[in-house]
């Protein structure tokens, strides 16, 4: 237990690790939003592009859930030795956040879409800016 606490405290000082966890949490929130009632699509025109790709909100929930869990897995100590896996995890999260930003922008470019695109785009960029000295190759 003491070793686990030490591991967590060491990692939680890393801005990269914290952002990885938070950005993965955002995807899990999107999973929850699409999975539960009421349906999300009728609530906002910003979701129009999501609906055009697939009107099944359950499919979107699975997509966001798997992406978020993959991101959380990238923070686990088991993968700490595999630098390429961690970098890939960061890249996948960045790609998913960029796609989400683009879909929000296409769904409602005139109103909330552009601001939402910038928000999601900046989250994507933030996830690519990991600190190599804290993720040394083994």
Question: What are the residue ranges of the model-derived segments?
Answer:
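Cytosolic juxtamembrane helix and N-cap/initiation of the first transmembrane helix
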Residues: 1-29
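Membrane-interfacial loop-to-transmembrane alpha-helix junctions, especially the N-terminal start
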Residues: 18-20, 81-91
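A loop-to-helix transmembrane entry motif
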Residues: 20, 47-67
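Hydrophobic alpha-helical transmembrane segments and adjacent interfacial helices
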Residues: 28, 32-34, 72, 93-107, ...
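Membrane-helix interface motif
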Residues: 31-44
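Juxtamembrane helix-break-helix junctions at the cytosolic face
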Residues: 69-85
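Membrane-helix boundary connector in multi-pass membrane proteins
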Residues: 80, 84, 95-117, 131-132
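Membrane-water interface at the C-terminal end of transmembrane alpha helices
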Residues: 121-138
């Amino acid at each position: 237990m003491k070793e686990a606490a030490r591991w967590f405290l060491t990692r939680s000082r890393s801005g990269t690790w914290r952002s990885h966890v938070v950005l993965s949490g955002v995807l899990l929130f999107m999973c929850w939003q699409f999975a539960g009632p009421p349906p999300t699509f009728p609530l906002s025109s910003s979701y129009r592009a999501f609906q055009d790709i697939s009107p099944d909100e359950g499919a979107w929930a699975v997509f966001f859930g798997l992406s978020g869990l993959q991101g959380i897995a990238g923070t686990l100590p088991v993968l700490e030795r595999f630098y390429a896996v961690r970098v890939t995890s960061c890249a996948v999260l960045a790609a998913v956040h960029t796609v989400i930003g683009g879909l929000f922008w296409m769904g409602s470019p005139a109103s909330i879409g552009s601001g939402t695109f910038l928000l999601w785009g900046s989250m994507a960029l933030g996830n690519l800016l990991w600190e190599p000295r804290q993720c040394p190759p083994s």
